[in-house]
């Protein structure tokens, strides 16, 4: 017996029952993004490896360990995108979108990272990305936060997440802070795990992300970045906090919150939940004003965030908030003889044309009326249209409403009129 080929580790299939929740989330998020005047952008899953190396930073986990990179047939190094912000910025630069106007954009799609698969973290995962390019004030930071808050409220999960906020200042202030952190963590090097020991020498900021309980105690007493950030970043953060207070947005300042990518600056934020274990961030983002310069163009202020679809689905399912769906079939068409099949197909296409929002199913059986009606009941069909030899001979159609038991025969040319009447009842 041949070995069954299975999906790649860390990459998942989503069957129709799973997709119902995904589609519900996508519908809500897209509706709200449209409400806020954000436009969709699409860009490739594969980019030149150098794009990410220049932008993310050579000493991040993504560059060092997690990227899916390989050489194409021309020996050029390419990478499956590990996140969407950089590709979005590149696309906007290449297409000249930032020459004439500011951009408010969104995208949805798969990202790829070679991580150890675990609950809520996969090697292929999906993100809703929200990006604003060309705006620098705290007011646009506020808009992004308001937008995500609205999404969470509409999905009925806002009571189960907490917004955490911080400022990581400028690149220069972080360089100074890294030296302070190095000196602090160096005292506890013997207590650090192997990963944190490595981070100590390449990027001590990343130690702040450790989930190890023993290391958490050391982190809690570490110097805070807010004490070392530049005045401009501090004023920006204070103004944002004032705006949020005036609007009435609940948040906590987490002085240990940093982002895993080097291009971030100033405002950073995460929505976290305690219902999904250690991998608790549902949405994360911040400002990345210097990303454009790392891509070789002029300064373009920017802010964005990414909503993790898989984690959002897990949270909704854990709360038993799975959306109610109507899987019932509106019209089930039955034919009783093989030689009537063409007439039945024509009828089904006519009904689909006239009622494009209704669910129309054509029976695959051509005999045994009892079995066909049994099928109609199993699929929760509301209306059955029956074509038998007598109906075809007399140019008739039999309609039966399985909800009320009402049935009626009528001339074929009355089908639209009769269905409209049946749908109203």
From Swiss-Prot:
It catalyses: tRNA(His) + L-histidine + ATP = L-histidyl-tRNA(His) + AMP + diphosphate + H(+). GO terms for molecular function: ATP binding; histidine-tRNA ligase activity. The keyword Ligase applies. GO terms for cellular component: cytoplasm. It is found in: Cytoplasm. It is an enzyme of class 6 (ligase). Its EC number is 6.1.1.21. Its main location: cytoplasm. Keywords: Aminoacyl-tRNA synthetase, ATP-binding, Cytoplasm, Ligase, Nucleotide-binding, Protein biosynthesis. GO terms for biological process: histidyl-tRNA aminoacylation. Homodimer. HAMAP family: His_tRNA_synth. Belongs to the class-II aminoacyl-tRNA synthetase family. This is Histidine--tRNA ligase. It comes from Buchnera aphidicola subsp. Baizongia pistaciae (strain Bp).
């Amino acid at each position: 017996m041949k070995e069954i080929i299975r999906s790649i580790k860390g990459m998942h299939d989503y069957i129709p029952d799973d997709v119902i929740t995904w589609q519900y989330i996508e519908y809500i998020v897209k509706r709200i993004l449209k409400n806020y005047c954000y436009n969709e952008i699409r860009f490739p899953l594969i980019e030149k490896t150098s794009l990410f190396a220049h932008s993310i930073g050579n000493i991040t986990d993504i560059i060092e360990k997690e990227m899916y990179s390989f050489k194409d047939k021309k020996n050029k190094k390419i990478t499956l995108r590990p996140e969407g912000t950089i590709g979005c910025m590149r696309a906007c630069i290449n297409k000249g979108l930032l020459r004439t106007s500011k951009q408010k954009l969104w995208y949805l799609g798969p990202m790829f990272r070679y991580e150890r698969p675990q609950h809520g973290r996969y090697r292929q995962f999906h993100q809703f990305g929200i990006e604003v390019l060309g705006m620098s004030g705290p007011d646009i930071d506020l808009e992004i936060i308001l937008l995500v808050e609205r999404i969470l409220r509409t999905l009925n999960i806002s009571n189960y997440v907490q917004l955490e906020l911080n400022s990581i200042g400028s690149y220069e202030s972080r360089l100074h802070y890294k030296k302070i952190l190095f000196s602090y963590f160096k005292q506890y090097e013997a207590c650090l795990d192997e990963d944190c020991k490595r981070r100590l020498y390449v990027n001590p900021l990343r130690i702040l992300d450790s989930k190890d309980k023993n290391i958490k105690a050391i982190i809690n007493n570490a110097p805070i970045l807010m004490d070392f950030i530049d005045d401009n970043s501090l004023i920006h953060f204070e103004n944002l906090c004032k705006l949020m207070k005036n609007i009435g947005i609940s948040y906590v300042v987490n002085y240990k919150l940093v982002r895993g990518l080097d291009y971030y600056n100033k405002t950073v934020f995460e929505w976290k939940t305690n219902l999904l274990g250690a991998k608790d961030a549902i949405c994360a983002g911040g400002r990345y004003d210097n990303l454009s310069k790392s891509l070789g163009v002029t300064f373009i202020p920017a802010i964005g965030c990414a909503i993790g679809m898989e984690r959002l689905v897990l949270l909704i399912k854990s709360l038993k908030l799975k959306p109610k769906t109507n899987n019932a079939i509106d019209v089930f068409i039955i034919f009783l003889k093989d030689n009537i099949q063409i007439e039945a197909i024509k009828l089904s296409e006519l009904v689909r044309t006239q009622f494009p929002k209704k669910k129309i199913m054509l029976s695959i059986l051509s005999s045994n009326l009892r079995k066909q009606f049994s099928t109609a009941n199993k699929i929760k069909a509301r209306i059955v249209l029956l074509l038998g030899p007598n109906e075809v001979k007399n140019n008739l159609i039999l309609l039966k409403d399985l909800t009320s038991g009402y049935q009626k025969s009528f001339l074929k040319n009355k089908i639209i009129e009769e269905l409209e009447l049946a749908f109203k009842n």
